[in-house]
């Protein structure tokens, strides 16, 4: 059975099927957690008329396509968000499964999957509600710290001369939580003092603690600046496009100076970029921290 997971031909498809289900569950979590509803019961129901959804129409990805984006019970429109999230999570996790079939490090596979699932959830919820639930930020930080103790390879610790791999990895995780959230707290406090209004929400500060738990303090610090850059790369073209099209500027959702914009999604995207692609490229820039963090 384990050969299925190690196969580069089968593993991504297996990951797609399994993680499409995780994407479906993420949709449930993203809808219910901000509203303080149970994610267990009741079962899935139509968002318009609350009719129960049969299991055969609730199959991830396929269900939305079969129904052509319309509810079977009342023919109301189903947001494409459900389909997009299920497909996105399935594709992302297929890539994770594929990348780990080479070295078969299932500790990193578990940690990477948990981290990606958490941050995709943050992106969805923060964009929709301007809030980051503590279950994702504080809960994610606790999960990252515990996983670091059990699976030291999360922080690149594979051997310690005195057999203290777990302690060294846990130290890196704890330092990431404290330095990451501490840096963003003071950036927000100073910016709030300078502009006379709240510049960063507490949710962003706690989210960076979660990022630090998985990425260490180097990844957390990178995520602050990487998140700001990612936000600028996305928001500046949108702002300019609205200025060039007067009809877009009249929209109630149009960007304007002084408008509150969620920072959490951009922190999350920068953290995912660091964790999966940029770690080896970015870490050499933090050589000055090597005395503090191996």
Regions found by a protein language model. Name each.
Residues 1-34, 157:
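Long, highly hydrophobic alpha-helical transmembrane signal-anchor segments
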Residues 15, 108, 114-232, 239, ...:
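Functional transmembrane core segments of multi-pass inner-membrane proteins
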Residues 22-27, 89, 93, 147, ...:
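Alpha-helical transmembrane segments of multipass membrane proteins
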Residues 26-81, 254-257, 263:
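Membrane-proximal soluble regions of multi-pass membrane proteins
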Residues 32-40, 98-102, 153-156, 192-197, ...:
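Transmembrane helix-loop junctions in multipass membrane proteins, especially transporters and channels
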Residues 45, 158-165, 246-255:
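Membrane-interfacial, low-structure loops and terminal tails that flank and connect transmembrane helices
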Residues 52-108, 112, 204, 225-226:
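Multi-pass membrane catalytic core of lipid/isoprenoid biosynthesis enzymes
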Residues 202-203, 240-273:
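Interfacial loop-to-transmembrane junctions
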